[in-house]
Amino acid sequence: MLSKEVVALLNEQINKEMYAANLYLSMSSWCYEHSFDGAGAFLFEHAREESDHARKLITYLNETDSKVELKEVKKPDNDFKSLLDVFEKTFEHEQSITASINNLVDFMLSSKDYSTFNFLQWYVSEQHEEEALFRGIVDKIKLISDNGNGLYMVDQYIKSLINK
């Protein structure tokens, strides 16, 4: 059985993962609205991955006979200035999730909850991949600036990242 503090922290992380899913759905819709269909499809798929992260946490809590407490998910932003703005905000959000996961890992280690510490290692690895992915997208968008042809090409590149 997990401690009450651990259960509370994991429930908070579920909420953060669900917020990320909703944020990426909002960003996906913005991309489709502005004819960035590749980026829209990519972010739509990424929203599914974020909800999978929440489900993985829910499963862990269920497997440990702990109480899952789903809370209200904050409304995500839906007003973006550009494709670069979308992906800069995505990258910033992933950095905040990484910080949250790192705090969880630190807490588990200091409280000697080695099972949950081990479980969270998947998230540590996942966040490393996420940050590298989104940093790369931001860098590519910055390379082409606001050039119409370049934006089309970067949209196609982003689409190619689905399921990689």
What are these regions (language model features)?
Residues 1-164:
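Iron-associated oxidoreductase/ferritin-like identity signal
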